[in-house]
């Protein structure tokens, strides 16, 4: 899977994403026998001079938003995720966002050796979310929500003045503790069990 990521003007970010952002669908049901549910999840990706911008739009059952702090257990909520790797690096970065715009951000070489980003770096990650408070009980029925995350290139070890030709990435939708757990991806994953920490299955974003 590949995408060409356009450079956009930040003066009107919403319109620029809608008109110019590269469209993607998070629609690969990689483990249909055990986790068949597939909420609708799509988005647009673009870049500014110094950041990657990813805008997610979701519609599905079991709206859950209980993690109210950064670097929590965001994957248990209704959650969208961006995993990124500069091909020249041995590590990759994961950014996991719930509907409140609260982010889990870590770096490391594999699933078992993740290091959370410090608080002073978390404030550099811009988020735009429609919801701003915890949902104590999961909302039933189909719910729609949107969240946009702006990830500075310096937080993924990339010099914005000398961008690589491409980076590797995958986009995910999950909800481990929702009534219908699901594990969707943009670029397909070929493993027996759900595992998003597989950079060998990342797609490519051309910058």
Question: Predicted regions: what is each one?
Answer:
Residues 1-207:
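Structural preference for beta-rich elements and adjacent junctions enriched in aromatics
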